[in-house]
Amino acid sequence: MQRNNEMRRVVVTGYGAITPLGSNAQASWQAIMDYQLGYGYVDKTELGIKAHFLGLIAEEPSLKGVPAAIRRRLPRFARLTLGAAREAMSMAFGESSPLDFYSPLMCGAIMGTGWGGLDESYYAAREFALQGVSSPFNCFYTMPNVTSAACSQYWNLRGYQNTVVA
């Protein structure tokens, strides 16, 4: 096996955010600067959740322009992630695509999550417990790496793909 010791650089040239404070990075940052809270009292005791102060994301980003083949099979956490990734890519490349500058084999996607897929796992388990059957697509909804897969498909990135789970 031949080793490639050539240094490669990764440059982050854009960022995106969808948070309880705002539907994009600018709105979230402005809310922080205005000392706004991103959490509030939410009673979920009927679901066995003892925490009462939660930060919930009220609205989802528009995924207009995302092909239906990608969009319709994404769980909520992946739709939120794709929305933030679109903001980051827009900041980095404007109206262009990464493929206008780089080979698709040299472009990849690395995403990170700490919770992604767990809510969907709980929903699927509950659905199965109540009905004895659940959607065959739940295997896709519960995968944390569905976000990096969606980004790779959307931008036609054919390089390295990974999802870091904390």
Report the location of each language-model feature.
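Short beta->alpha junction loops
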Residues: 163-166
